[in-house]
A protein has these predicted regions:
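N-terminal signal-anchor/initial transmembrane insertion module
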Residues: 1-146
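Terminal membrane-anchoring module of integral membrane proteins
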Residues: 1-57, 149-153, 224-377
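Helix-loop-helix junctions within predominantly alpha-helical proteins
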Residues: 58-97, 123-198, 211-229, 270-302
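Charged, amphipathic alpha-helical oligomerization/scaffolding segments
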Residues: 93, 97, 120-123, 127, ...
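Inner-leaflet juxtamembrane helices
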Residues: 103-124, 196-210, 301-328
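Long, hydrophobic, amphipathic alpha-helical segments used as structural scaffolds
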Residues: 106, 132, 136, 218, ...
Length: 377
């Protein structure tokens, strides 16, 4: 798998460029059937090598997942438990390996929307470069690239360690279907969470660049030379940036909804297992099962943080800084009526349309999901 520096920029947006390693990982895992044209632009083709690979991989792992669930359901419970807890245990087994079968199906239908979203990023970058300046070669993007590459390499190391640990686990080493499906499911969930995290980092860097450029303009010009045209350019760019961030709820609505519910279920089951069986597992010295529950709890709780709060605090700080800059601009001097109106509209736009990276109560995600469902009727 490649890193950022190995992926040609061409006419791709910096968002596409930074997330390139994760798209490669999705393609290898068979969850995202896409190709790239001569300019490196992301696109989906129904008939292509990538699509055939995704279909064959999906069919193979669909069967493997069914066989793995069947195998796990027949295994005796690790300790004595009630019928209700047996059902929960089997449900937990199924939840663990479900992503290997379901996520490729969901992503197959959302790849086209992802392509459209990347195109919107390309259009946004054109306006961003015109108003703010070319971001691709700045020190800030170099720093972000290094940060993203560290995240990507950390994921690879984590998956290698996890794969070795699962391979030596007594509950999976005897069944190839369980082993392969478990590793693929964990890989899919980790890379999707990482992709979401990188998206938050890119948005944070974009807003920060916007804020710094606005600050530079204020320091360079006196208030009378900061014209209505410049203010309007900043306002329209802000609105476009806000729509782009909230568009996350449309382009991967079903995928991220599945991931959030999946991680929530795993967290709840892990807490339940530790609360009900933790003391018993320690007494019986079943440290393997205890460690598995703890790792599942920590990892999935981290994923929930990434989905629901990651990036919010940082982008909120940037947004608040922009608001303060506009208030400073508004109070610099007496403005003409037209300029004062433009600044007021700008301030209202920043207050009402804040591109914060979060999923408040699933609103943004399920808004897109509900729209997709209603469009079918």
């Amino acid at each position: 798998m490649s890193t950022i520096d190995d992926v040609p920029a061409a006419t791709r947006s910096f968002f596409d460029h930074l997330c390139g390693p994760f798209f490669v990982a999705f393609r290898v895992l068979g969850v995202c059937p896409y190709t790239r044209n001569r300019n490196g632009v992301f696109r989906k083709k129904t008939v292509s090598v990538s699509s055939m690979y995704t279909l064959i991989s999906g069919a193979t792992f669909g069967y493997a997942t069914f066989a793995a669930i069947k195998t796990l359901s027949r295994q005796p419970p690790p300790i004595a438990m009630s019928n209700f807890n047996r059902i929960l245990l089997k449900f937990g087994y199924g939840t663990l390996i479900a992503p290997s079968a379901f996520v490729p199906v969901i992503m197959w239908f959302e790849t086209t929307k992802l392509q459209a979203y990347l195109h919107e990023w390309r259009l946004f970058q054109d306006n961003y470069n015109r108003v703010i300046g070319d971001l691709d070669g700045t020190i800030m993007i170099v720093i972000v690239k290094k940060r993203v590459n560290r995240i990507y390499r950390s994921i690879i190391v984590f998956l290698l360690i996890t794969g070795v640990a699962i391979s030596w686990s007594s509950s999976t080493i005897n069944d190839l279907h369980v082993l392969v499906c478990t590793i693929k499911s964990i890989s899919i969930m980790v890379f999707i969470a990482g992709f979401w995290f990188v998206g938050a980092i890119v948005i944070e860097a974009t807003i920060d660049g916007y804020k710094k450029k606005l600050q530079t303009e204020l320091d360079r010009h006196d208030s009378f030379r900061f014209g209505a045209r410049s203010i309007e350019d900043y306002r329209l760019l802000w609105l476009q940036m806000s729509r782009l961030v909230h568009g996350v709820g449309d382009y991967m609505s079903a995928t991220v909804t599945f991931c959030i519910f999946h991680t929530t279920i795993v967290v709840v089951l892990s807490v339940y297992a530790l609360a009900v069986w933790g003391a018993t597992l320690v007494r019986l010295r079943r440290y393997e099962a205890l460690a598995s529950a703890l790792v599942a709890l920590v990892c999935n709780a981290t994923f929930l943080y990434v989905y629901c709060d990651c990036g919010y605090s940082q982008t909120k700080k940037c947004v608040d800084s922009v608001i303060l800059l506009i208030l400073k601009l508004k109070s610099l001097a007496r403005w003409t009526t037209s300029n004062y109106i433009q600044i007021t509209l700008f301030l209202n736009a920043v207050n009402q349309y804040q591109p914060n990276v979060n999923v408040i109560g699933f609103y943004e995600i399920n808004r897109g999901l509900l729209g997709s469902i209603l469009s079918c009727f």
